[in-house]
Amino acid sequence: MDAISLYNQTTLECSKLITERYSTSFTLGIKTLAKEFHLPVYAIYGFVRYADEIVDTFHDQDKQALLDRFKKDTYEAIESKISLNPVLHAFQLIVNEYKIDLDLIEAFLHSMAMDLDFKTYNDSKYHEYIYGSAEVVGLMCLKVFCKGDDAEYQRLREPACKLGAAFQKVNFLRDIKSDYEERGRVYFPGV
């Protein structure tokens, strides 16, 4: 294995470790997929996990500045096809290999920024947040699963979005107490 291949593999394995440490259920889900999809999905999870950590964890930091830097670094990694941040390097490998649309990444990062700006959500913001925080993550994974078959991607796009939205709503229910008590957030409109 040459040096760049070793670096690429190591960064992908970092994302696998992040997934294993942060989500045993997601790790188990990934293991049900064909082996060829494991590392790409770990890379997507590593990216979304770190963005989520910025908005949910680093309370003594300027979260907006951290998220802005993460966003800038993400796009630089994708464009230059390299990053010294192992999570972003692994993610850019998958974005570039599977041609993941930048608008999906932008929608995701926008939803992360919404967590900094909104504490309660009306119907419109609720659906906007779910699209960016969950549906687009499913669409990124769908790009991997379809391996460039655009017709198959379009056929499965709507069901993938519905599945992502359902998972997010379950997460909202699971975390309703901590979201409110620790972060002051209420995602469900009218609650």
List the predicted regions and their residue ranges.
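Acidic catalytic motifs of isoprenoid enzymes
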Residues: 1-191
